[in-house]
Amino acid sequence: MSENRIRIATRKSPLAMWQAEFVKAELERVHPGIVVELLPMSTKGDVILDTPLAKVGGKGLFVKELEVAMLEDQADIAVHSMKDVPVDFPEGLGLEVICEREDPRDAFVSNLYKSISELPLGATVGTSSLRRQCQLRASRPDLIIKDLRGNVGTRLAKLDNGEYDAIILAAAGLIRLKLSERIASFISAEESLPANGQGAVGIECRTNDERVKALLAPLEHLETRYRVIAERAMNTRLEGGCQVPIGAFAEIHGDEMTLRGLVGNPDGSEIIEGVITGPKTEATKLGVALAEELLSKGAKSILDAVYAKA
């Protein structure tokens, strides 16, 4: 492999391609003369579009094919939305870099209404995220919530066709695809706690590939890493997957980190919440401690019930 060449495995969706192009541009910026190739490929998550994610295996659906490409030396790195990255990595692969975070909030998208509070009784809202569904049902039990799969363009088309009164998407995806004008309003973290890692881009590579790791190093954003590591540590301790509504959101002020988390029933009938503050350098410890607090407050019974049905 040429010392000055790097191959990026990426999904083919517009948002995944944006992320890969972003990393390509950053690599070209910090390493003038580098040759960066994109290798677009389909994953199971891109193919199975008629079934809710929670029912077909969850987050790993979007990364497995990319990981195989790296393990077989067909690609050097893979670029992911951090909220799609599973907790565990195959042997020989690891998360090397977390890039600076885009807006982590959820976005309310509607052609008719400006916010959730404006929605009339019984309005239809589209989202496949159990985390969003749970928090929405808790605040607005009158709403009819329907699953919504597909890439961002497909989801917007379904809204425009009148299948939904509103849909909820990650703000970061709309901003990156230059579709900010479609955002009727941003949903505060207090109203809808984001998913762990939402808005952040991660780069995975072979753990023994020192050449690639050295090329990637300048793309690391340490503050984003602290935040995402805390959020993921909480999720890991809870053994959270796509079948359970879990939200985690860390903010940093100076050297202090505040991490908020929640676990809910999918129907929104019960939500366990918690918050913890501590040194940002102890991100993992804070995430685990908050998870323990949530478990002791009743999250364990919610998780046990959900996994018993799975």
Curated annotation (Swiss-Prot):
Pathway: Porphyrin-containing compound metabolism; protoporphyrin-IX biosynthesis; coproporphyrinogen-III from 5-aminolevulinate: step 2/4. Its EC number is 2.5.1.61. InterPro entries: HemC, Porphobilin_deaminase_cofac_BS, Porphobilin_deaminase_N, Porphobilinogen_deaminase_C, Porphobilinogen_deaminase_C_sf. CDD domains: PBP2_EcHMBS_like (cd13646). GO terms for biological process: protoporphyrinogen IX biosynthetic process. GO terms for molecular function: hydroxymethylbilane synthase activity. Binds 1 dipyrromethane group covalently. It is an enzyme of class 2 (transferase). The modification S-(dipyrrolylmethanemethyl)cysteine is found at residue 242. It catalyses: 4 porphobilinogen + H2O = hydroxymethylbilane + 4 NH4(+). GO terms for cellular component: cytoplasm. The porphobilinogen subunits are added to the dipyrromethane group. Belongs to the HMBS family. Tetrapolymerization of the monopyrrole PBG into the hydroxymethylbilane pre-uroporphyrinogen in several discrete steps. Monomer. This is Porphobilinogen deaminase. It comes from Shewanella sp. (strain ANA-3). The gene is hemC.
